[in-house]
Amino acid sequence: MDKNLEEKVIWLVRHAQAEHNVGPPGNHRRINQVGIKQWEALHNWLVDNPIPIDVIVCSPLRRTLQTMEISFKSYIHKELPVPIKISPLFEESGNWPCDCAMDLSSTEKLFPDYDFSSCYDDIYPLRRGLYGTTYDENYCRAQKPLKHLASLHEKNIVVVTHSVYLRFLLREQRPEDNMNFMPPEKVFRNCEIRKYNLCHTGFQWELIPLIDN
């Protein structure tokens, strides 16, 4: 296997707590006051414990974009800023209103500094096809973002995404699990960051935990 692929490091991050995490699952929920403290805590941790980051890949939903902007501001606003790639492959899995993205024109107005061209694929933000919400559709989609990460030339990659979709990326989600509700002990905490190697098993790409999380 290519040495660069063997050594590719992926840092997975769940977004900060948003309004829907503690209230009704309405549309396009913002980060709440607890979430603001969480993303500041992650930012402070990264200042005290800097990690090498070559690129940040982020889901195009509001809560992930907000989390990325604040938590990683020391990387985004430095003299040579870390590039940011927005990818709909990393959006959430469920069918609650809060898991459905805004129309792209509204998202681009709220976040004008980022390139959303990857979202113009004739499907997104509709929840069908590649972005369908069934277990099988999500299971199939979850292999595509890992292939995408493998194709990037950057070695150290941060991914800012969502709780249930993280379980699909890690092959932990089971058909019998309720995608619209998972007990806290089975998901990443808000603003939790974990370190993985991206490896190919011979059949598919997998994320292997690194012991220095």
UniProtKB/Swiss-Prot annotation:
Gene Ontology molecular functions: phosphatase activity
Keywords, comma-separated and alphabetical: Hydrolase
Active site: 15 (tele-phosphohistidine intermediate), 92 (proton donor/acceptor)
Keyword Hydrolase found: yes
GO cellular component: cytoplasm
The keyword Hydrolase is assigned to this record: yes
Site description Transition state stabilizer, residues in chain: 162
Protein's recorded name: Probable phosphatase SPBPB21E7.02c
Top-level EC class as recorded in UniProt: hydrolase
Database matches in InterPro entries: His_Pase_superF_clade-1 (IPR013078), His_PPase_superfam (IPR029033), PGM_Phosphatase (IPR050275)
EC number(s) per entry: 3.1.3.-
Family in the record: Belongs to the phosphoglycerate mutase family. BPG-dependent PGAM subfamily.
SMART domains found in the cross-reference section: PGAM (SM00855)
Lineage of the organism: Eukaryota, Fungi, Dikarya, Ascomycota, Taphrinomycotina
